[in-house]
Amino acid sequence: MLKTQHKVYFKDSAKMGAVKTGSVDLVVTSPPYPMIEMWDDMFSRQSPLIEAALIKGDGSKTFELMHAILDPIWTEVYRVLKLGGFACINIGDATRTINGNFRLYPNHMRILQKALELGFSALPCILWRKQTNAPNKFMGSGMLPAGAYVTLEHEYILIFRKGPKREFKKNNAKKIRRESAIFWDERNRWYSDVWLDVKGTSQALGDKDTRLRSAAYPFELAYRLINMYSAKSDVVLDPFLGTGTTTAAAMASGRNSIGYEIDPALEIVIDRLKDVIVASSKQFIRERLARHVEFVVQRLKTKGRFKYLNQHYGFPVMTAQEKELLLNDPIKITQPETGLFEIKHAVKPQKEFCKNWPAELTKI
């Protein structure tokens, strides 16, 4: 039986004393975006200098002061990560008019600068395209030249590694890594540097104000990153947990997780995970398996037979690295204490995908 633990702290992540140095395999997070108006009050509560700079109309100083609030958290992220561990940070730039001056505030560049100062190695990032059909999406002078502005419809997923490349030396670690593989057809989409197929969050968080405060990113985004940059039973940290999306994705992926959230009002939202995570994870995993089967069927029509079979499911796969791939359903969740969830995961494949496949699928 695969078991995972998921701990949530409602504290400031600038001091993550409960997390040991070098104990985390992966960080997946999305901080409050500096210079986005909805976050002004939150940043100002932590530093009166920010409110003063806003009142004065000093955009550049406000930008730097807001990032100074985030800097200690990135320092903590670097501390708790293992050598070879990854940090994936979803961040959007901001556009804003202050004191009559419209400009871009490049949040991704400021975080990149801090990460490099800490000693992280920067890896190729992902552009997440968030298209909007809002009628007022065009900024500036509309159709007239020398006064209109490019529409900002993308965010960044910055990817960093601490130290040298991770190695899987022990036999059990190698086995877990093989079982944690992703499908070839997923790899071509997931490891692309532009994501066009991940839609914005549609989570039902109870009320509009809660959704705004959380700035939740979609489950699919966190799930992909966790499966791309960690193995089963690894520890995933989110220092800006919000509504618990990263925790939910870790639960669905057979990883352990730690989350920090400074807003106590979100505790009730995160607590609801125990009511929905088992059923929703099973559905998501089955949709993932079904997409692979559909890929197999379509490829057989155009390219012919496959060379390899998955050992657990029996369906064809493109590469030998997918032969031991296994998706573990969460089957039971308990909450032994406030802020702690424990999950038992199935170690056998989903029965409906372990049938006798037609000869045209399995004949090599």
Predicted feature residues:
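S-adenosyl-L-methionine-dependent nucleic acid methyltransferase catalytic domains
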Residues: 1-139, 148, 183-364
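Core SAM-dependent methyltransferase catalytic element
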Residues: 82, 118, 147-166
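Surface-exposed flexible segments
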Residues: 103, 169-174
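Histidine/acidic-rich helix-loop-helix segments that form or flank divalent-metal centers
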Residues: 144
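Proline-centered turn/helix-capping motifs that create local helix->coil transitions or kinks
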Residues: 165-171, 187
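Active-site-adjacent helix-turn-beta-strand microarchitecture at beta-sheet edges
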Residues: 173-184
